[in-house]
From Swiss-Prot:
The name this protein goes by in its record: 2-C-methyl-D-erythritol 4-phosphate cytidylyltransferase
Site features described as Transition state stabilizer, chain residue numbers: 18, 25
Gene: ispD
Coiled-coil residue spans: none
GO molecular function, one term: 2-C-methyl-D-erythritol 4-phosphate cytidylyltransferase activity
UniProt xrefs under HAMAP family: IspD
UniProt-listed Enzyme Commission number(s): 2.7.7.60
Family affiliation: Belongs to the IspD/TarI cytidylyltransferase family. IspD subfamily.
Source species of the chain: Corynebacterium efficiens (strain DSM 44549 / YS-314 / AJ 12310 / JCM 11189 / NBRC 100395)
């Protein structure tokens, strides 16, 4: 049986400006490269991805196209097809637009936040391979360090056992047919009763078992100025040894 193609959806359509810059955080630069570019390079370096669809807002399409063209990343780098697709107002809308843009009926789809710009390529491959081995939905996770409280307003309700908790990262991997079906049902349901905070929660709602694999501390999300300071410190000390693409 032939290998399923692997298509990555790279979410970069958000309007988040919590990093304090004038442009969406996906296009903020870290050591000379935008977060979206770093995430794209990690996908290419993983050696498991056949196509990358970058989800951008319509008003950022020209900016993204010029940036990635100048970097040589829109001309099938390393034999991987890379293209831009308009995202929606919410993350779920963007993912649905990306799923509709995939040409295949059967594939493995990886959904990744561009703000997780230091995600190791090996972790990307680990997620994709677990789906290829038969798991319909896979998420990378790391242990929770802090004690978590469930609250009602300002009152503590209970304290979940920290040993049972995990922080979830991306990329999350899925069988395309199952994820499409879950999205179709969600968007066709007038009141689904919840707002999915990630794609795995949508699959849980749809009744699909979600499998965990080991995540990586480097796959943290660059959201606030403090996150950016940490990312800058890491890349200042670690590059070019572990994050730069060989031969760059």
């Amino acid at each position: 049986m032939s290998r399923l193609p692997v298509v990555a959806l790279l979410a970069a359509a958000g309007r988040g400006t919590r990093l304090g810059g004038p442009i969406p955080k996906a296009f903020v630069t870290l050591r000379g490269r935008s977060l979206v570019e770093r995430s794209l390079r990690a996908m290419l370096t993983s050696e498991v991805v056949d196509e990358v669809i970058i989800l951008v807002s319509p008003d950022m399409e020209d900016y993204a196209r010029e940036l990635l063209t100048r970097r040589g990343l829109l001309n099938d780098p390393e034999g991987v097809r890379v293209r831009l697709v308009h995202g929606g107002g919410e993350r779920a809308d963007s993912v649905w637009a990306g799923l509709q843009a995939i040409d295949h009926d059967d594939a493995i789809v990886l959904i990744h936040d561009s703000a997780r710009a230091l995600t190791p390529p090996g972790m990307i491959a680990r997620v994709a391979r677990m789906v290829a081995d038969g798991a319909p939905a896979v998420i990378p996770v790391v242990p929770v360090a802090d004690t978590i409280k469930r609250v009602d307003g300002s009152t503590v309700v209970d304290t979940p056992n920290r040993a049972d908790l995990r922080a979830v990262q991306t990329p999350q991997g899925f069988l395309l047919s199952r994820l499409r079906a879950a999205n179709e049902k969600f968007f066709a349901t007038p009141d689904p009763g919840f707002i999915p905070t990630d794609d795995a929660s949508l699959m849980e709602w749809y009744g699909v078992e979600v499998t965990c694999v080991q995540g990586d501390p480097m796959a943290f999300k660059v959201t606030t100025p403090i996150d950016m300071m940490l990312a800058q410190r890491i890349t200042d000390e670690a590059e070019p040894t572990i994050f730069e693409v060989p031969g760059d």
